[in-house]
Structure formats: C-alpha cells, structure tokens
Amino acid sequence: MEEAKNMALLFFMDHLMQKNGRRTIHDLSCQFGARGFSEEMRNAVGTTQEGLTEFLQGHPSLFTVEGDQVILNGHNDLNAKNNPLLQSGIRSRNYEKEAVDFFVTKLTKFGPELQIKSLLGHRSQAAPEVRLVSGRHLKEFCEFLQSQVDYFVVEGDRVRLKNMPEPDENAIEMDDEGRPLAGVKAKQAAVEYLKSVLEQNEDQPIPLDQFYQNFCQRFSHTIRQDVATNPKELLQFLKLNRGLFFIRSNKVSLVKNRLNEDGSENGSDEGEETNNNGMFPLDQSALTRIHFVKALKPAQDLISRLWQDINNMEKKVVGLDLKTVTVGVDGEIFLSLGVIATTSQIGIFDLASSDVIILESGFKGILESEKVVKVIHDARRVASLLAHKYAVHMRNVFDTQVAHSLLQHEKFNKSLNEMRPISFINLQRVYYPQSIMLSDVTPRKMSMCPNWGVRPITEEFQLTIVEEAHCLLSALYQSLSNLIPVHLRGVFEDKCIEVNHPEVLLASPNRPPPQPFISSPYRASTRRDVRNGGSIMQSFSPAPYAAAPRPQMSDACTQTFSTGDIEVLNVFYE
C-alpha cells in the first residue's frame, strides 16, 4: 500500500508539472482512469474526489489545496535533487538508474546516436518517476543526459552512447593514399563495403538493423558521422544509391540489374545522370574556388570575374541562391547572403554587411540580365523581396520548384494549385541523389536549417552555403530541363515569369502597397550618391508604384454614392 501511495504521488506531481503546477480536484480525479494509474493506486488515494482531497491535504509539503484548486509547491524548481519523494532515504528504488537504463535501451535500439529531441520523444513511454527525474523539458533533459557522463556523450543537439559498438580489427580507417577517410571518400568506402556484404548474402535480404550492425563493425564513429549514425540515417543513405540497393519491408538487397539490348546493365531509371558540364566537385579542395566578399570593392572585382566566366560559356547559365533571415517580432524578412555559381568558381556575397553590394557591385546586373539563365529553387520566396525593397526584377529564370510542379502535374494529372512545394534536399533525393554522395556536406547537416545570419563564416560553413547553387548548376538544371516535355515548355516559361513578377500578385485590394527600400537590420548603410547628393536608398526606391493617398476628412452629410465618397465593397442577397 505504501508503494502505491508513493506511485500515486509521483503521478499527480508529474501531471501538475505538465499543467503549469495548478489543476482542479475534478481534473485530477479524472486521471483515475488514465494509463499508468493502477487500481492499487486508486484504492490508496480513495476512489472519490473527497478521498483524493484528503489524500493530497495529507502531504502539505508537496501540495496546497485552496478550495477546488490543487497547487504543486515549488513546481518551478522541482527536480530530482530537492524532491523529497526521490531522496534515497525514503525511496527503495533508484529511479535515476531506471531512467538511465530506459534511455540506454532506447539508444541501443534506435541509435546508438540520435537527436536529443528524438530521444526525448520516447520519454512518454516511460514510468512517471522516470519522466520526473529526467526533466520535464528539452533543456532539463539535456542537463540530465550531460550529468550521466558514464553512459551518454552529448554533442550539440545529438546524444550517443558512450559504450557504443566499435569496429573490429578489420576496421577501415584510411583511404588509398594513407589519409583518414572523410567526406566523399568515406561515403564511397561505405557503399563498397555494404555492397560486398550483400553480395555475400545474395540469396536472402538482410534486415536493416542487422545491416547497420555490420556497418558499425567495419567503420569507426568518426566515419559513421559522415554516412549514418543510426539505422534510420543508413536507410536514407541507401536510398541515395537506389541504383545499387533495394529496400522493402526494412530489408536490404542488391538491385537485380537488367541487360539492355546493347548489352549494358541498367539498374535504376531515375537520378542516374552524371555530372556532364565539367563543374568541379564540392569537397574540401573546392574551397580555393569559393570566394567570400563583404565589401563593395571586392564584390565588384568578383562580379567582373564571374562575368568573364559567363561570357566564355556557350550557353550562359549560373546557379543562384539567396539566403534570408527573419528579424523582429513581426517576422520581417531580409536578405543575408547571395550566391552565384559558374562552372569554375562560386561567389558568396554578404548582403547583410552592406546594402549597396546588391545594387552597385553588378550583382543586380546579373539578376536582371536577359542573356543569362539563373537557375534557382523556389524564386517566389525572394522575388517579392528583391522587387519591393531593392527595385530588382529577375529575368530569364529557371525555377526548379516550378519544373517539379509541372512534372508532377504531368505524371499524376493534378492541378498545379494542389501541388505542394518541395524542399531542396528532397529535390536532390528525387532527381539527383548523387549530388549528396559527391559532396562533403553530410545528409545530416543538409537536412537541418542553418541560421544564415551567423557571423563569422567559417570555411566549413561556406561549403554548406554554396551547396544549393552548386547542385542547381552542376546537375539539376540539365536533368530537369531534359525531363520537361516539349508541350509544357511554354507553360513552364510563363509560370517562371509569373513567380518573378510580384507586381502582378499585388494587384489585389487585400494586399498592401509595396514598401520602399529599407536598409539592412544588421548594419545601416552610410554610402551616399556623391553626384546627386542624395541617399542611395532614394535613388533605388521603386518608382513604378504610386504612394497610397492620405485619407481626408469629409462632412457626413455630403458623402453620397454619386460623389464617390461611399463605395460598395460587397452586396449580399437573402
């Protein structure tokens, strides 16, 4: 009976902590039928509201009963250290050890490395005392994991087992040149090993969990971080190589290659095109081709070099990406970074450091050039921003978001308005998964949403910044361009024009007039137009739009339909 009382106390404390420390007696009594509230616990506290009230009043150090309200004392700072129920002198069970064992079991099953918030999601399956000692919220849960240094290792937003599976003596640690495996070479080595495992068991598919254990026995944790740190990530990695691996019912086997008429083998019919435009791979060696500028003069020089590359192209195409940040309570969007990629170099422009870079460096000229194709993903998100804050109107745009929607429309015969937008990482997985394999940027990092307002920008972060523009130019442009049917090319061009001309969308009484140019929230621009003596903001304010007239006062008796002072907005009929 004493054990049941303690369990009931823990249950109500946990419920009150989840509900901000205050609930009614009626609400607590409704928990009698909740999952985890046993019949012994109900008998211990009384099966009625009156019995529950007496039970709670019998523990004044924990609860305060005011009328029909129950308040948990000190719920803001309640934890395992100052909770009298969890002191070692009172309890007979080590709840902290039970919590550790619970999360070790979950990491062993789903890990051995997971995002902390993913591991926290399993907390709802634990007993009330385990939920109590491990913390109520993400911050407290992180502190609990960090305190258990003998069991867990916390790195950023991820946690892994300290005693995780380690490779055997046949572990692969070095490449052919004797250097540690990393990046693209680590992914290639993983593919070759996993392929060899399946070739040895060709007759029978291997369960994914067992397949991951084989992977852990051959590669150390450092290398696994570039490929997959848990079975779920390994599944995503295998899908990037769907020309080799076939997955069904969480079992993995090799793709059965078919012989074509010419005798060549064909395994997968989509996403198998190669990088045929001669563009450099995106790895550590590519850093010499990536140029980061944050001042006007270096930006002008970089634009000149980019124009030289463009003019030497037979078909003038660049990859374009504009990174934005959201600032303030109202969520106002500003440009933070601009990326332009050619086949030989990539330029990163820090648009947050200086407002005039986009206007005076020549960046605007590339965006508005009719002779240069700009390949961008989801241009609608930045077209309105460019037009109404900078008076920049992009022309000759190839929007991969529009291309994907048209292809889905053709395949499934759905209306374009019903098509959901696709993220860039999923666009890569569908049309060119090799771009992830050929990049040093891990799929884990690519699936996250970085903060593009972070400064300073490291070399590793530069690879993340240019990934989208590089992939758009090196692979997705040619792939999607070839997939668009001839009869849809006219529609595609019209849709690209539509998303890049937000003034058409603004012709609605429900939308506000366009805003004048606004300086960056990071650093106010002090550059002036010396020739005219005016501000650069005045020089580039959007002239085509007239300012809204100021409201005027009128005598009520003179306001009529004929004078135009009264307008009919909607007419309703019964």
From Swiss-Prot:
<dbReference type="Pfam" id="PF01612">
    <property type="entry name" value="DNA_pol_A_exo1"/>
</dbReference>
<dbReference type="GO" id="GO:0008408">
    <property type="term" value="F:3'-5' exonuclease activity"/>
</dbReference>
<dbReference type="InterPro" id="IPR056589">
    <property type="entry name" value="WH_Egal-1"/>
</dbReference>
<dbReference type="GO" id="GO:0034587">
    <property type="term" value="P:piRNA processing"/>
</dbReference>
<dbReference type="GO" id="GO:0005635">
    <property type="term" value="C:nuclear envelope"/>
</dbReference>
<dbReference type="Pfam" id="PF23713">
    <property type="entry name" value="WH_Egal"/>
</dbReference>
<protein>
    <recommendedName>
        <fullName>Egalitarian protein homolog</fullName>
    </recommendedName>
</protein>
<comment type="subunit">
    <text>Component of a dynein-regulating complex composed of at least bicd-1, dlc-1 and egal-1.</text>
</comment>
<dbReference type="InterPro" id="IPR036397">
    <property type="entry name" value="RNaseH_sf"/>
</dbReference>
<comment type="function">
    <text>Part of a complex with bicd-1 and dlc-1, which is recruited to the nuclear envelope by unc-83, where in turn, it recruits dynein to the nuclear surface and regulates nuclear migration in hypodermal precursor cells.</text>
</comment>
<dbReference type="GO" id="GO:0003676">
    <property type="term" value="F:nucleic acid binding"/>
</dbReference>
<dbReference type="InterPro" id="IPR002562">
    <property type="entry name" value="3'-5'_exonuclease_dom"/>
</dbReference>
<feature type="compositionally biased region" description="Acidic residues">
    <location>
        <begin position="262"/>
        <end position="273"/>
    </location>
</feature>
<dbReference type="GO" id="GO:1990923">
    <property type="term" value="C:PET complex"/>
</dbReference>
<keyword id="KW-0539">Nucleus</keyword>
<feature type="region of interest" description="Disordered">
    <location>
        <begin position="259"/>
        <end position="278"/>
    </location>
</feature>
<feature type="domain" description="3'-5' exonuclease">
    <location>
        <begin position="312"/>
        <end position="414"/>
    </location>
</feature>
<dbReference type="GO" id="GO:0005875">
    <property type="term" value="C:microtubule associated complex"/>
</dbReference>
<dbReference type="InterPro" id="IPR052144">
    <property type="entry name" value="piRNA_biogenesis_EXD1"/>
</dbReference>
<dbReference type="GO" id="GO:0030473">
    <property type="term" value="P:nuclear migration along microtubule"/>
</dbReference>
<dbReference type="InterPro" id="IPR012337">
    <property type="entry name" value="RNaseH-like_sf"/>
</dbReference>
